[in-house]
Amino acid sequence: MTLARFALALLFGVLPEVVGFESVLNDSLHHRHRHSPPPGLLYPHYLPTEQRHRRTRPPPPLPRFPRPPRALPALRPHALQAGHTPEPHPRGCPAGEPWVSVTDFGAPCLRWAEVPPSLERSSPAGWAQLRGQRHNFCRSPDGAGRPWCFYGDARGKVDWGYCDCRHGSVRLRGSKNEFEGTVEVYANGVWGTVCSSHWDDSDASVICHQLQLGGKGIAKQTPFSGLGLIPVYWSNVRCRGDEENILLCEKDIWQGGVCPQKMAAAVMCSFSHGPAFPIIRLVGGSSVHEGRVELYHAGQWGTICDDQWDDADAEVICRQLSLSGIAKAWHQAYFGEGSGPVMLDEVRCTGNELSIEQCPKSSWGEHNCGHKEDAGVSCTPLTDGVIRLAGGKGSHEGRLEVYYSGQWGTVCDDGWTELNTYVVCRQLGFKYGKQASANHFEESAGPIWLDDVSCSGKETRFLQCSRRQWGRHDCSHREDVGIACYPGSEGHRLSLGFPVRLMDGENKKEGRVEVFINGQWGTICDDGWTDKDAAVICRQLGYKGPARARTMAYFGEGKGPIHVDNVKCTGNERSLADCIKQDIGRHNCRHSEDAGVICDYFGKKASGNSNKESLSSVCGLRLLHRRQKRIIGGKNSLRGGWPWQVSLRLKSSHRDGRLLCGATLLSSCWVLTAAHCFKRYGNSTRNYAVRVGDYHTLVPEEFEEEIGVQEIVIHREYRPDSSDYDIALVRLQGPEEQCARFNSHVLPACLPLWRERPQKTASNCYITGWGDTGQAYSRTLQQAAIHLLPKRFCEERYKGRFTGRMLCAGNLHEHKHVDSCQGDSGGPLMCERPGESWVVYGVTSWGYGCGVKDSPGVYTKVSAFVPWIKSVTKL
């Protein structure tokens, strides 16, 4: 087998390349684990001496200025098969290969902006376009020679060297579009492929990331039978998924034989947020985390004009590319000018979107820009040494913080100078700035990382300044450095960080707060949740009115992770991200503590005398029931949707008395309930209180009011050992008709006519209360549709216990088990008179079990007791 492989390779002239490449890989992997050389290409200086000298040529002595390298003859292609001829050395490095930043003998390239001025003064004309560029990609400015770059030699001097831009490149072949195909790797002048053993989505994602075709790859396989004769370089590739190129992944050198199932590795590149979002990439930066923004639309790549471009737009781009960290917008073709069409203009993201497609913007292709206005972004990863300004009104001002060892910390102002400020602002993309008192910004609770910082003003990075060791200082947070950088004419909006949304509210201005982090929507725990936190959420969503916080899963329990706990906003922040003081995902909560907000909240409006009189003269009005259509059947009701619903509670000095029964408000001072509610604790008025206007039993609300009990009247025919005559009236404390104050959330129900038969006159019936939901008793007021049934159903089921003073109601369908358990004992069964008002026809009384098939609920028939009710209440 070995002899056959050797003969076959010799026949096609590929033996030196394939064998040499395996030697490079083996040697590179060996040194990578022992000496950890810089990541990147397989550096030839790790080869044996004779191989290194045979394959490379040492650079010439450093001239007074770098000469543009001469073009070398193209290497003779080794034909593997028809249609598979390796390409000669390219004259430039394509945008799809941004990781090529070393010479062909392994020296890392310098950034073009870091070339000493002494060389720049005498530079060739063809090189002028590269001055000031922040990237270090190999280039051929005159277009005639092999790509080259500057590098620093062992003596600290600047030299130049050629690059092989194809070495280590990848491409996708065998598909009709550029987003999928068989993976091929270029090495030693020959394109080869990868065995599909252990090939998964993490490996595929690295390929897609390397080709700038999206942040998510799907692993595929291709039969070798359709590839022809092509070398196999690797098997068992084991990427984590966050590597910048496939060379940095662990893998095995192919030792020959047959790949499992005779399949080669292939990929399909896509985006994690779905095909509706445009495909984007970053081009021209020094790494995959920055560059000119380009979009793929209508079959071609194009750029974005920088009109209105700011950090909020950059936040969305970074999120769509699945790049975390600090997002920053760049203007005026900072990463070089593009060459395709200008696709978009006037992009105005809030920073809360998941894709640029969701942002306000011009129509595709409409603009008034040239490529000198191409927009760029940087998505700076949170690595040691990253800086930010926090606690201010925008990203241009605040307390200086440095990221180190997984935590943000501050800088002490001992010896702080204007040069230090200049270096910080320049690194953050501003031209200049000034020191500001840290007292103007919220005090940090984190560590103090740096002290005695001294910059010369020439540094490009803050950490290049002299300083003490990390964590060594003699300061307090009163000495934290504060800085205000000048945004200039371009303007900079604060990056809004994590997207937020409101869920399960009655309208778009309220709901459970959910935040999008790490690709998943999750909730916020209500520990310490206040109106100040709510104000920041509403501001981030664009609402300017008053905000109110809601706790205890006021809008229902969410699903998924609880992302954030112990939010501490001052109320002045622009986004939730500025208020998070605790690690993401760290909490001690359940979803029963999910936080919510109400935006543009204008509270309880005072009613004039004329309005009070009009409300007291009518009954059965639901002023809020038409605000939104809801699915009825054991679901949360609308706040204020059942304004006559009240609760009978055990009296407590802490206003947390236990709910005993539901009840129905008949007037300002009289409440209707069930007699059995007083069996356990007696009829002493000192034991009870009535709460009106309530919705969430654990959250104090603006319309609710707790009123003492003045009198309890139980029907004289009621016996504790019987369910007949199960009706009672409660007189509230207060002057006549001035006990409960009427408003949109507190109104009386209507009484039926004496001996009225609701089965013939009523429709659209509901029960309400804080009753059994199937798992526990509800914290929020529930409502469920229910049907009035012929009395024979209950007479057959309950025999002699069912009397003519009772109503039979429920749902007999197997999939609709709604009965009296969904309401509360003593609570109302309400029906609507067609074209008129709402009438209390029943009082929740008794039944056999909860939600049991063929066991309808039994309700006291109010129409049978109208004379008694009127005689007691004088209504």
Curated annotation (Swiss-Prot):
Where is each Kringle domain found?
93-165
Per UniProt, what is one GO molecular function of this protein? serine-type endopeptidase activity
Please state where this protein is localized: Secreted
Composition bias (Pro residues) maps to 58-71
A GO BP term here is:
proteolysis
Segment Zymogen activation region: which positions?
Answer: 619-630
Tell me which residues make up the Peptidase S1 domain: 631-874
Keyword list, A-Z: Disulfide bond, Glycoprotein, Hydrolase, Kringle, Protease, Repeat, Secreted, Serine protease, Signal
Q: Which residues form the SRCR domain?
A: 170-271, 280-381, 387-487, 500-601
Primary subcellular site in the record, as a coarse category: secreted
Annotated signal peptide: 1-20
Q: Which SUPFAM superfamilies match?
A: Kringle-like, SRCR-like, Trypsin-like serine proteases
Record-annotated active site = H676, D726, S825
* Gene3D superfamilies per UniProt: Plasminogen Kringle 4, SRCR-like domain, Trypsin-like serine proteases
Give the Pfam families listed for this entry: Kringle, SRCR, Trypsin
Checking PANTHER family in the record gives: EGG PEPTIDE SPERACT RECEPTOR, SCAVENGER RECEPTOR DOMAIN-CONTAINING
By what name is this protein known?
Neurotrypsin
Q: Which species is the source of this protein?
A: Saguinus labiatus
Question: What is the organism lineage in this UniProt record?
Answer: Eukaryota, Metazoa, Chordata, Craniata, Vertebrata
